[in-house]
């Protein structure tokens, strides 16, 4: 999280100092085909399929804003060809953290609907047709209990709305995972 925040600050500084239009996107828990094997959903799928114990942190009490890859791509495509502009209504005493007087902008790309991690795991079990075994563990240092994107500015500026229901996205992920790993 610290590196992401410092990246945004550096982008803002360049935009401000050199009047360079810069747009950043914040992606929220991206999942789908070609997901990395070290990410939670692929670990859960692998564990359920292979009867391995699933490590579930924060005793399963996490909430995440899962965003299907197609929705992420659509969101990025909406903003990529529109350079950021200065916000002439920006007021330093009550700043809008997503804009400034510099040509700089930040957009959240997410589903806008945090889901309980255990609901996601149970949905994976339903799709696979098999129950998983769990090892519930405390929250890892530096982790957060919940992520939740506010995509209202992206919706307002670019008419963006995520369109993939999470159950459909999970079905596509499991289908891809089985095809990729088992032929």
Give residue spans per PLM region.
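Short-chain dehydrogenase/reductase
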Residues: 1-8, 35-42, 65-66, 114
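Active-site Tyr-X1-5-Lys
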Residues: 1-23, 49-50
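Hydrophobic alpha-helix immediately C-terminal to the catalytic Tyr-X-X-X-Lys motif of short-chain
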Residues: 6, 10, 14, 44, ...
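Flexible, glycine-rich beta-alpha linker
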Residues: 20-40, 62-63
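Short, hinge-like loop/turn segments at secondary-structure boundaries
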Residues: 41-43, 151-152
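C-terminal substrate-binding subdomain of Rossmann-fold SDR/epimerase-dehydratase oxidoreductases
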Residues: 48-183
């Amino acid at each position: 999280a610290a590196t992401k925040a410092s990246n945004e600050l550096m982008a803002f500084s360049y935009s401000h100092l050199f009047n360079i239009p810069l747009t950043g996107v914040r992606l929220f828990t991206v999942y789908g085909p070609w997901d990395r094997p070290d990410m939670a959903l692929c670990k859960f799928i692998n564990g359920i399929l292979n009867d391995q114990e699933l490590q579930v942190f924060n005793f399963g009490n996490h909430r995440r804003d899962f965003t299907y890859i197609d929705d992420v791509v659509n969101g990025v495509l909406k903003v990529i060809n529109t350079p950021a502009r200065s916000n002439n209504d920006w007021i330093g005493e009550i700043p809008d953290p997503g804009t400034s007087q510099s040509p700089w902008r930040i957009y959240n790309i997410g589903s806008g609907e945090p889901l309980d991690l255990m609901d996601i795991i149970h949905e994976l079990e339903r799709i696979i047709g098999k129950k998983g075994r769990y090892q519930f563990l405390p929250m890892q240092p530096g982790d957060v209990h919940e992520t939740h994107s506010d995509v209202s500015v992206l919706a307002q500026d670019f008419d963006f709305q995520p369109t993939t229901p999470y159950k459909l996205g999970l079905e596509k992920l499991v289908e891809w995972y089985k095809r990729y790993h088992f032929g």
